[in-house]
A protein has these predicted regions:
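Transmembrane alpha-helices of multi-pass inner-membrane enzymes
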Residues: 174-234
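Juxtamembrane transmembrane-helix termini
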Residues: 18, 25, 41, 152-166, ...
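Long extracytoplasmic/lumenal interhelical loops at the membrane interface
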Residues: 78-138, 161-162
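A membrane-periplasm/extracellular boundary helix in multi-pass inner-membrane enzymes
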Residues: 10-19, 36-80, 97-101
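Alpha-helical transmembrane segments of multi-pass inner-membrane proteins
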Residues: 1-38, 158-159
Length: 237
């Protein structure tokens, strides 16, 4: 299985490199950052921290591999001041802010990119990310509420993983899912990632984490029965 997971990881990194979107870089970094926090193993904590620092340093402080177009493209995510498209986004957000100052509860649900429906008023600048779309549609009030709700979700799920879920197999699966969610939300600052079907996957992860304490005793019992059967079989042999 380790070989299988290694192959999948390599394919995912390659796919991220050729995807053409620099926001994809935020997904593994956000995931690793949360894994460092929820990991209860010093070995995993140390390995994840070193991996995070090594990868960040490679892209942010070196020019190694700039001859490769994919590495060069990924590295530009760490140097936004040199990215022309990012500078256009910054200018658009400044213009949006001037309009949003007069709309504390936004333009309305679906009106960040709903000009085709002919509403009375619509944001003239296209939102370049999911969080910007939330801000445009619900205003600063809605954005703060959105961030608060998801901050509580991440904190609650992390607490459950660290202190309530004892089964190692279940904790590993749910930690991987929650860390993926963290990566998605970091990427949501730069890209419209919460589109169908991504939102279904993300909120299924939250739901499973919250249900984890109820699933945990069932899996613990199953693992204990399997272990007992293995021991009995070993004695018979």
């Amino acid at each position: 299985m380790k070989v299988y997971f290694a192959i999948i990881a390599i394919c995912a990194i390659y796919g991220m490199g050729i995807s053409g979107t620099r926001a994809a870089m935020a997904v593994p970094f956000g995931g690793i950052a949360l894994f460092i926090l929820v990991s209860k193993s010093w070995k995993s904590f140390a390995f994840s921290t070193l991996a995070f620092i090594a990868v960040f340093s490679f892209f942010n402080f070196t020019t190694i591999g700039d001859g490769n177009q994919y590495i060069r493209k990924m590295r530009s995510a760490f140097r936004p001041s040199e990215d022309a498209s990012y500078q256009v986004r910054v200018e658009n957000r400044k213009k949006m802010k001037g309009l949003m100052d007069e709309k504390p509860i936004g333009y309305g649900i679906g009106l960040s990119k709903g000009a085709q429906y002919g509403p009375k008023e619509v944001m003239p600048y296209p939102p370049d990310s999911w969080l910007v779309a939330v801000w445009v549609e619900t205003g600063i009030v809605g954005l703060m509420l959105y961030l608060l709700i998801h901050g509580v979700l991440f904190a609650w799920c992390s607490w459950l993983l660290m202190f309530k879920i004892m089964n190692q197999r279940l904790r590993g699966l749910l930690a991987a899912w929650l860390c993926m969610n963290a990566g998605f939300f970091v990427a949501a600052y730069a890209n419209d990632v919460m589109q169908y079907p991504n939102s279904i996957i993300v909120y299924t992860g939250f739901a499973l984490c919250i249900a984890g304490p109820y699933i945990d005793p069932v899996m613990q019992k199953e693992d204990e029965e399997l272990e007992r059967e293995r021991k009995e079989k070993k004695k018979r042999d």
